[in-house]
């Protein structure tokens, strides 16, 4: 064999198996997918105004494509159900926060409780896989 890959890769100064490295990368990809998931509803919201319609549509499609790409990368090394649940959780909670901070969405105790339940569910999925 001309090219041989070591079964161990360094990560942050410590040895880590390829499986551990792939798992860490899949969680990074999933986190990025979740962040990009926040962008497409923002793009749709921006497109509601006539003067920013095409900009908003371009933002929405760009973020959808990036979110899908990173979700695809994440699912190569983790269960589909876990990836999808975490992806939608990050997207939902992040979109809620952006809506409250930048678009004047209502902030109530019940809505905060709902987002906290999403975040807790995502944490449980993270630690169970």
Model-derived regions, located:
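Polytopic alpha-helical membrane proteins, predominantly small-molecule transporters/carriers
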Residues: 3, 17-129
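Intrinsic disorder/low-complexity segments
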Residues: 6-10
